[in-house]
Amino acid sequence: MQFNYSMKNIPMSSTVQAYMKKMLNQGENFLRRANWAAFFAMNKHITQSTLETFGFKNPNAPPFVKEFEEFKKAFLEMIRNIKFTHTGNDFQTQLKSDTFKIKHTPEIIVPADKTRNWYKVPIGDHKKLLEEAVTKEYKRCDQEDIDKVNEETAKIAHTLQLHDRMEKFTVRDAYITLKDHKPNFPSRISTRLINPAKTDLGIVSHRILQELNSEIVSQTKTNQWRSTKSVIGWFNRIKSTARTTFIKFDIENFYPSISRELLVKALDWASGFCKISDRNRGIILQARKTFLFIEGKPWTKKNTVNHFDIPMGSWDGAECCELIGLFMLSKLTQKIFKPDEVGIYRDDGLGTVRGPGRVAERKRKDISELFKEYGLSITSDTNLTATDYLDVYFNLEDKSYRPFRKPNDHPQYIHKLSNHPKNIIKQLPKMIAYRLSVLSSTEKIFKEASDIYINALRASGYTDSDLDDFRYTPPDPNKKKRRQRCRRVIWFNPPFDLSVETDIGHKFLALVGRSFPKGHPLHSTLNRNTVKISYCTMNNMKSHIDQHNKSILNPRTVEANNNGCNCIRSRKAECPLDGKCLQDSIVYQADIIPSDPNNNLGTKTYYGCTGRPFKKRYYDHKNALSNRDSSKQTTLSKHIWELKDKNVEHRIKWSIKARAATYKGGARYCNLCLSEKLTILMADQESTLNSRSEILGKCRHKWKYCLGSIKIN
């Protein structure tokens, strides 16, 4: 399946509702942070918790702050009144057409591993390829194994006081990419297995390992590279002679080759530079207990102890590899190299050798034996006067370096007409030119390398006038970073879309200035310097393919969500939802209609949502409507009891307003709750019984996925 553009291009929103959902989600996140900031500003006697949260959000709704309420109401009204316009262009028409084709393709659309190709694979063939990849390295395990690991993780979460924020092990099915760069493709298909299932403890482990690695690098001064820029700095410091050559090595299957014993040895070694508490060590090792899922069924890695694994894409996988890299660098610099002669980036190493070819060959064998001693195997090249490393090509003979791309790897960039914020479109040529400048040792090399990138930009709709800023900008090593005040900023990140007519940025900043002028109690906390806006984006083309694949692999059939009605035959006519009372995952609507049409009260509407079959939620409402002790359970029951006290005859008509999926572990938000909140926001405020304060309410569907819901023995 061919796409002649970057999959990072973004089509315009297919529906207004899709945009408004994301806007409301981003707006809710902003309001929560701003509301908490306002609460602590108005209650200075309450000290903010010094608890380390590792980025996990507080699930609770923020408290009421009188001074913040007017801004909150105006902000939600701003979102409600966003205007849209009909717009488009030829490129957006093409994206819309391709999105439609993707959505209606019956096959799985699988990406290539190292190229930009995409392949349609029938469901049966995809299942076979996936099973072959999984059974090669994994074996089946039981749900009890996952429950045990979750219970162990829950104990740690309780000690961190984050049990109400951290979630159980996420159940996400593994997927594959096709290695179409391998020989004999497609007659012989090789795949790469990707495991997206993660543990939240990996986020904690990520922070611990990141700080640990930084401390080790600071003390040892070893060349643990984290960027191309640091490799170039090392290259420029090389004092090369006529006999200086490169030696390059690559650790094969680095992630899966790391054993528990090797990680423990690396931690023991690291403890000599920085104290590693028993708690932190336990967190790192507990985060290694990993599972893989196919159709929701768990698998665990073969030949490992206690489910140990470091899957690619895990929260702390890269940091684990960096720690192992630092450990191996220490061994290399003790036995084979001087500290300034070798460095490593993840699984790629690069060093220099002075002397004849036999010296380099001996070092190659020594490196291979050293890594083999720790259960790792490498491939290596020696006696190189020039070589590629990461995205740079280094030449020792003339001490030059230039940008490097693999053969047939042509760059692709977002189109000028993509649904991206204008500043990103405008700055892209300048950003690419600066990157090429960093990767080029001279202006001449920059100009020689520029053609392929300029042509790629032109293919993406950029004109010559757009490329005026595409020029060589040599990095200044003596340039000092501008000192910036460490100010706590609360960001609002609304989604950008070309179809939006309203100038959201202008209206938002004007609202902040108008709501919190000088003299306002919250001005020092919420002002134009502490509250800022930066646009996020809608789903790109790759996201649309991912969503398509999920819908094919995990079909939610109509029957699964349309279980009909189980009311007894003689009372079918009284079914509250017209024969659909067993439907789940819905936003429902209750219209309270006075029996007397001349009644001045008029029809009132209540909106709610349920992830359970509607009938169970209906019985909860029915109990509240017949039991005065439960009259304040919802605004619906409160209103009904007010009507009863006034002897107003009425009837309730139930209906389905929207359908949406309930929250799943690891998701960014609950689609069902968000649909309910959007319905409340857009409802007529005169006739609805719901309050907009419900928009900041806590999701009721997340708790069962939290570690706090586990009973610890």
Labelled PLM ranges:
Residues M1-S187, D466-D476, K481-D497, E501-S515:
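Non-catalytic, polymerase-adjacent accessory regions of viral genome-replication enzymes
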Residues K139-D180, S218-S230, K248, S257-E261, ...:
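Amphipathic alpha-helical blocks
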Residues V171-S218, E252-P256, T304-Q334:
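Conserved pre-motif C helix in the palm subdomain of viral-like polymerases
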Residues T177, S205-I208, D250, G313, ...:
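GIY-YIG nuclease signature motif recognition
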Residues K239-D366, L370, D381-Y389, E397:
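Conserved polymerase palm-domain catalytic core
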Residues I276-N280, G343-I344, G351-K430, K447, ...:
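Polymerase palm active-site segment centered on the conserved acidic dipeptide of motif C
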Residues Y389, G611-G665:
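Conserved short loop/helix modules at catalytic or binding sites
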Residues R435, L439-L582, L643-N713:
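Boundary/linker segments flanking structured domains
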